[in-house]
Amino acid sequence: MSRRAMVIKMPILMILISSMVMTMVESSRSVNNGHDDSEILRRHLLTNGLGVTPPMGWNSWNHFSCNIDEKMIKETADALVTTGLSKLGYNYVNIDDCWAEISRDSKGSLVPKKSTFPSGIKAVADYVHSKGLKLGIYSDAGYFTCSKTMPGSLGYEEHDAKTFAEWGIDYLKYDNCNSDGSKPTVRYPVMTRALMKSGRPIFHSLCEWGDMHPALWGSPVGNSWRTTNDIKDTWLSMISIADMNEVYAEHARPGGWNDPDMLEVGNGGMTKDEYIVHFSIWAISKAPLLLGCDIRNMTKETMEIVANKEVIAINQDPHGVQAKKVRMEGDLEVWAGPLSGYRVALLLLNRGPSRTSITALWEDIEIPANSIVEARDLWEHQTLKQKFVGNLTATVDSHACKLYVLKPVA
């Protein structure tokens, strides 16, 4: 494809996507007019003091599914500390589905499962907090959660929010299964208001799967919003989710982030290079970096990927701008996004079957044409000796990437 054809094609695609979803957004606005919109809007950006940068931590679902208990959660908290991951910013320990009994108690409260959480969630929260970490919990904007093994919070939003606050919960992943048929744009703000009244700042993660494009309405409602369906530990799943999430790049900002789902790094379904691509794209996309492997038993290879301080720094950059695709030529892609300090994050991605060279042009990544640029390779941990003018070209292996920070020096 010629560069002109490519440049024209991308805006047209964005226009088509935008026009497709605008009717849905207007509908959601009209639905919400019956609520106190000013109360919801107070949550916009930083009003709960959370999500200034994308959250980092761990979630139980990808590796353990429903096979969780308080011993494993405590051991995971221990591992975050002993591995040094907590010092890098991985501070959330998030319990996913299946933690509660199927029935509420006589007061209408959720009951931690006696067989797996005999000490209760508050005791687990106290332990996690004693390690300098934060505890996350899971619920659902329906009558039951997705596993159907425990109740959802539909109709109990205020009661459950107060319970979570009393337990010391710091993060709520709020799923979208088994509802009453009403739209997420109706059900999710109810929990938002309940959390605001709970007396405790709780990060609100909207797990709506992207069905009604929550990137377009999520910022007054939550601190992050899923833009896609669930990830699987395969190259095809990961890369297709990255594509879908990128469409909504302009909606990410401090206080509210696009969420392409938890990380699969370390679960064994991809190669090392593919996991590096996975972690790199999530980092430049300002996605939540929630580990989904068993961090108690991480390999050295996995640790080297998820503990890359330079890549994490891109994700946590205070500028808070999600990177976008700026050039696509067949299986070759150039992603770029601005960073603080007049720097640029640059990803060269080879989705194809063979090793090849990829070129990034300054005009595509909004660097002045005659600028002399220094390039830092974040996976090789070295600043390239060569200075670059006008473009940068690198040879990239199949299903692999190069990740740089570019800094104009003249």
UniProtKB/Swiss-Prot annotation:
Q: Does the keyword Cell wall biogenesis/degradation apply?
A: yes
- UniProt xrefs under InterPro entries: Aldolase_TIM, Glyco_hydro_27, Glyco_hydro_27/36_CS, Glyco_hydro_b, Glycoside_hydrolase_SF, Melibiase_C
What are the disulphide bonds in this sequence? 66-98, 146-177
Q: Name one GO cellular component term.
A: apoplast
Q: Which reaction does it catalyse?
A: Hydrolysis of terminal, non-reducing alpha-D-galactose residues in alpha-D-galactosides, including galactose oligosaccharides, galactomannans and galactolipids
Subcellular localization is given as:
Secreted, Cell wall; Secreted, Extracellular space, Apoplast
Q: GO annotations under biological process?
A: carbohydrate metabolic process; cell wall organization
Checking Pfam families in the record gives: Melibiase_2, Melibiase_C
Where does the signal peptide begin and end?
1-27
Please state the protein's primary subcellular location.
secreted
UniProt-listed Enzyme Commission number(s): 3.2.1.22
Which keywords label this protein? Apoplast, Cell wall, Cell wall biogenesis/degradation, Disulfide bond, Glycoprotein, Glycosidase, Hydrolase, Secreted, Signal
* Positions annotated with a glycan in the UniProt record: 297, 391
Q: Active-site positions, per UniProt?
A: 175 (nucleophile), 230 (proton donor)
What are this entry's molecular-function GO terms?
alpha-galactosidase activity
Keyword Transferase attached: no
Ligand binding (substrate): 96-97, 173, 208-212, 226, 230
Describe the function of this protein: May regulate leaf (and possibly other organ) development by functioning in cell wall loosening and cell wall expansion.
- Family per similarity comment: Belongs to the glycosyl hydrolase 27 family.
PANTHER family referenced in this protein's UniProt entry, alphabetically? ALPHA-GALACTOSIDASE 1 (PTHR11452:SF80), ALPHA-GALACTOSIDASE/ALPHA-N-ACETYLGALACTOSAMINIDASE (PTHR11452)
Known partners and oligomeric status: Homodimer.
Q: What is this protein called?
A: Alpha-galactosidase 1
